[in-house]
């Protein structure tokens, strides 16, 4: 069952984020393990700066609310990480996490708290058609 992670899930969330980092082929950050930063980030998310949708032992989708680059009074919800452990990728965990995120984004938009919400597609992500879920492609990011 998908639920919101809380402070008692910190260690499990950090461990899962390390798995996400290691599987996403970000060679530039493989050695980064700043636990102090992770605890601060998670504390801010748990205090209301975002949410972590979580299925214990299976996967998570982490998102944060941030000001847009155009106006510090206009906010957007950004997905930071969507990860399902490989042994659970044939089930519904990934879709349910995605669905929880979409519902949260729609809820925030309807309440006027954000203007938009984003979804990231990594080069190692499944080839999903995000347009089916109301998203439109705006950019691509390249890393060097």
Language-model regions: role of each:
Residues 68-79:
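A conserved beta-turn-beta hairpin within the catalytic core of GNAT-like acetyltransferases
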Residues 101, 114-128:
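Conserved beta-strand-loop-alpha-helix junction that forms the acyl-donor binding cleft
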Residues 40-54:
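A short helix-loop-beta-strand connector motif used in the catalytic cores of GNAT acetyltransferases and
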Residues 1-33:
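Short amphipathic alpha-helix that is part of the acyltransferase structural core
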Residues 80-92:
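A short, internal acetyl-CoA/4′-phosphopantetheine-binding micro-motif in the GNAT/acyltransferase core
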Residues 57-66:
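Conserved beta-strand in the GNAT
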Residues 90-105:
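Conserved acetyl-CoA-binding loop-helix of GNAT-fold acetyltransferases
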Residues 120, 136-144:
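Conserved catalytic-core motifs of GNAT/GCN5-like acyltransferases
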């Amino acid at each position: 069952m998908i639920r919101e992670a809380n402070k008692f899930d910190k260690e499990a969330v950090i461990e899962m984020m390390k798995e996400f980092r290691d599987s996403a082929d970000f060679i530039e950050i493989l050695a980064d393990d700043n636990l102090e930063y992770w605890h601060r980030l998670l504390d801010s998310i748990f205090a209301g700066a975002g949410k972590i949708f979580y299925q214990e032992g299976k996967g998570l989708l982490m998102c944060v609310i941030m000001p847009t680059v155009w106006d510090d009074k206009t906010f957007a919800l950004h997905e930071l990480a969507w990860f399902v452990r490989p042994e659970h990728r044939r089930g519904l965990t990934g879709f349910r996490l995605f669905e929880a995120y979409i519902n949260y984004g729609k809820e925030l938009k309807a309440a006027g708290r954000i203007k938009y919400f984003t979804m990231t597609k990594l080069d190692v992500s499944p080839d999903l058609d995000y347009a089916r879920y109301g998203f439109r492609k705006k950019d691509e990011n390249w890393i060097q």
